């Protein structure tokens, strides 16, 4: 990893959880992100999980895999899973990975 990585969780109190990811998502941090998303998706009180990439500056294939892992676990537990605010090279990485159809990539937001 060449840059900082931070994650902040916000619970809206009504079953919605927003995971805000900042910095770079690469191989060095992808496992940690996967575990964070899995943990959030497995919480009984969660109905909708949003991963906000508005301040994410880089994502490689390992980062894409983390999002897909989080989505898979969320859907298995009956949760909605949304990736929001994918911009610039992060959006391009999601398109290049071929997950646009699966994640419904649309106007800076990814929804599943």
Show which residues each predicted segment covers.
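STAS-like cytosolic regulatory interaction modules
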Residues: 1-58, 68-112
């Amino acid at each position: 990893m060449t840059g900082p990585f931070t994650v902040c969780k916000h619970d809206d109190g009504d079953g919605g959880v927003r995971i805000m990811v900042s910095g770079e998502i690469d191989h060095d941090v992808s496992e940690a992100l996967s575990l964070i998303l899995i943990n959030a998706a497995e919480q009984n009180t969660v109905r909708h999980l949003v991963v906000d990439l508005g301040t994410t500056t880089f994502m490689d294939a390992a980062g894409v895999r983390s999002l897909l892992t989080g989505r898979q676990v969320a859907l298995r537990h009956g949760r909605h899973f949304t990736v929001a605010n994918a911009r610039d090279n992060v959006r391009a990485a999601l398109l290049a990975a071929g997950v646009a159809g699966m994640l419904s990539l649309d106007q800076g937001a990814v929804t599943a």
